[in-house]
C-alpha cells in the first residue's frame, strides 16, 4: 500500500469495510474501538521479563495500527514472533542474549525441557498451538 494522504490517515483500511460486529442482533461496521477490544485482552501468561513485555506490546501496537493499514499485520506478526523468540531465550538461557540456533531450535529445546508442551505424535501440525 502506498503512503496515505494526510487527510485520510485516520480512515480505516478498506479491507476493514466488510468486517462487521453483531451487537444485540444488529450488524454494524467494525470500529477502531472494536479492533482495540480484540487486541487488548491478548496478553502474556505469567511473569515475563520487561524486555519481553515491551516486545510483545510493540507487536500489539502494530496490530492496532493495522486498522489503518492492513499490511501492518505482517509487521505485527513478525514482531510477535520476535517477542516469542526472546521469551524462549530468557526461559532457556536466563537472559535474552545470544542463543544458538533458530526459532525452530529454541522451540525444540523448550519442548525437551518442558517449557513448551510436547507435540502429540501423529497430530496434525495445525492442531498444535505452537506449530499452527
What do these predicted ranges mean?
Residues 1-73:
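Charged alpha-helical initiation segments
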Residues 75-78, 82-132:
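Amphipathic, oligomerization/interface secondary-structure segments
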Amino acid at each position: 500500500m502506498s503512503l496515505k494522504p494526510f487527510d485520510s490517515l485516520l480512515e480505516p483500511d478498506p479491507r476493514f469495510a466488510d468486517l462487521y460486529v453483531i451487537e444485540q442482533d444488529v450488524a454494524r461496521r467494525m470500529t477502531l474501538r472494536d479492533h482495540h477490544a480484540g487486541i487488548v485482552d491478548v496478553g502474556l501468561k505469567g511473569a515475563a521479563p520487561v524486555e519481553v513485555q515491551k516486545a510483545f506490546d510493540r507487536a500489539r501496537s502494530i496490530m492496532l495500527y493495522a486498522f489503518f493499514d492492513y499490511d501492518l499485520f505482517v509487521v505485527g506478526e513478525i514482531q510477535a514472533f520476535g517477542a516469542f523468540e526472546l521469551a524462549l531465550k530468557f526461559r532457556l538461557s536466563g537472559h535474552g542474549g545470544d542463543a544458538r540456533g533458530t526459532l525452530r531450535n529454541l522451540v525444540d529445546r523448550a519442548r525437551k525441557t518442558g517449557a513448551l508442551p510436547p507435540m502429540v505424535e501423529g497430530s496434525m501440525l495445525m492442531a498444535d498451538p505452537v506449530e499452527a
